[in-house]
Amino acid sequence: MTSKRRNNGRGKKGRGHVKYIRCTNCARCVPKDKAIKKFVIRNIVEAAAVRDISDASVYEVYALPKLYAKLLYCVSCAIHSKIVRNRSREARKDRTPPIRFRPMRGEGGQNARPGQANKLFNMSPRK
């Protein structure tokens, strides 16, 4: 039978069995090597309240703690929540991670937004 992917959608090479984990979203059992992993680092305090807390703090330079979470998704939940997308047969062979959006100062002192990257850098949109 033909294979859709070189790794059959898994990271298991030479191992007979891999432990199962539960999907963060739907609690489905998924092999650990097949699960789509997403590591999220967020501030515990939302951005709107950071200034209020820093003003009310006794310490002048207090670094607010961050929330670290490793999210593990089954394939269907990852597709549904747009963490991964369907790709063409040729694009599936490309194993490089997607380019991450990093906000930079744009023209006129405005913060760049994901939808306006083309205007700031005169790039054509991806298809």
Curated annotation (Swiss-Prot):
Start and end residues of each stretch annotated as Disordered: 86-127
Pfam family, one: Ribosomal_S26e
Keyword check for Cytoplasm: yes
Cell compartments where the protein resides: Cytoplasm, Cytosol; Cytoplasm; Rough endoplasmic reticulum
A GO CC term attached to the entry: cytosolic small ribosomal subunit
PROSITE patterns: RIBOSOMAL_S26E
Subunit text: Component of the 40S small ribosomal subunit.
PANTHER family: 40S RIBOSOMAL PROTEIN S26 (PTHR12538:SF0)
Protein name, per record: Small ribosomal subunit protein eS26
GN (gene name): RPS26
